[in-house]
Every structure is written in structure tokens, then in C-alpha cells.
């Protein structure tokens, strides 16, 4: 991953634009019947928890809810498969704060596996943080997106 200013085409050092979590959120935001990863599989062993998360994202969903967005600027979308929700948020090169309202969830407690841009993601696009927490339909999550950043979660009923 690379920030906007550091991105370049180099054959022996492939990179993608945007933060690590921006790339992870794409698996939820963009509906695609065939998901794939670029590069050598051994490259993904460095951050196994990211690969494990991506592997759990289905290629088809039962329900889709557009939570927020503005064309060419940002998007937040929730998709359900069975009893599991996947939420993805992505921004363009403008950093932003957003609130993700979880009122689409049914009653009860859920476990949210969350990946967010790290504190240094605006300078080091691979920086991310992972959090696991209990959430309910009453929660509103405050999210900070780095330039070219993202946020994603897998939410399962407890």
C-alpha cells in the first residue's frame, strides 16, 4: 500500500493506492462474484489477520444497505450474509470523520471484528489497527479515515 505521494509503478516492488484498510474495505464495498488477491501468496503471511478477514467476506450477500456516501468522495455500506454483517467505508484522498450508525442490526449483542486506519496511515499506508468489541443496534461508531483510507468490520450475533 502507498499514500498518494509515494505511489509509483515499480516492477520489483508492487503497490496499491490507499491504505491497507481501504483495500480490505473494497471486498465489502464492491460486490464481485470472484474475489482475488494480487501478488505472491507468501506476501500475505506477513499480516495473516488481514488475510483471514478477507477470506471471510462472501462473494454474494442477502441484503445491502447504503449507510452514507457521496459520489467520488466517500461511501459506507453494510451487507448481510445469513446472520453476519460486513460493513465497509472508504474515502478518496480527503481525510474525514464519519459516524456509522448500527441501527440496521437486530436486537441483542454482536461481536464486531474491526479494522481501521492506524494513527500513522496518512504517512505509512500499511499502518492499521484491529479491535474486537461488543456492539448493539443502539451504537454509533465514530470513525477516522486517513487520506485514501478505509474502515471495515465483520459483525456477528453473540
Question: What would you call each of these model-derived segments?
Answer:
Residues 114-138:
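Solvent-exposed beta-strand/loop surfaces of large extracellular or lumenal domains
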Residues 29, 87, 148:
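Conserved, mostly hydrophobic/aromatic
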Residues 51-77:
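Edge strands and adjacent loops of beta-rich recognition modules
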Residues 71-107, 151-152:
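Carbohydrate-binding surface patches
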Residues 132-158:
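C-terminal beta-strand-rich structural cap/linker in extracellular carbohydrate-active enzymes
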Residues 1-41, 68:
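Glycan-recognition surfaces
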Residues 104-118:
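Solvent-exposed beta-hairpin/edge-strand motifs
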Amino acid at each position: 500500500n502507498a499514500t498518494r505521494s509515494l505511489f509509483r509503478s515499480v516492477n520489483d516492488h508492487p503497490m496499491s493506492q490507499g491504505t491497507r484498510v481501504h483495500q480490505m474495505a473494497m471486498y465489502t464495498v464492491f460486490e464481485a462474484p470472484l474475489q482475488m488477491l494480487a501478488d505472491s501468496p507468501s506476501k500475505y503471511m506477513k499480516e495473516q489477520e488481514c488475510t483471514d478477514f478477507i477470506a471471510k467476506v462472501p462473494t454474494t450477500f442477502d441484503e445491502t444497505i447504503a449507510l452514507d456516501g457521496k459520489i467520488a468522495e466517500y461511501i459506507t455500506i453494510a451487507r448481510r450474509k445469513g446472520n453476519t454483517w460486513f460493513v465497509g467505508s472508504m474515502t478518496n484522498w480527503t481525510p474525514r470523520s464519519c459516524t456509522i450508525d448500527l441501527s440496521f442490526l437486530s436486537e441483542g449483542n454482536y461481536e464486531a471484528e474491526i479494522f481501521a486506519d492506524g494513527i500513522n496511515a496518512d504517512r505509512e499506508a500499511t499502518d492499521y489497527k484491529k479491535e474486537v468489541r461488543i456492539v448493539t443496534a443502539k451504537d454509533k461508531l465514530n470513525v477516522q479515515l486517513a487520506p485514501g483510507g478505509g474502515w471495515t468490520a465483520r459483525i456477528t450475533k453473540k
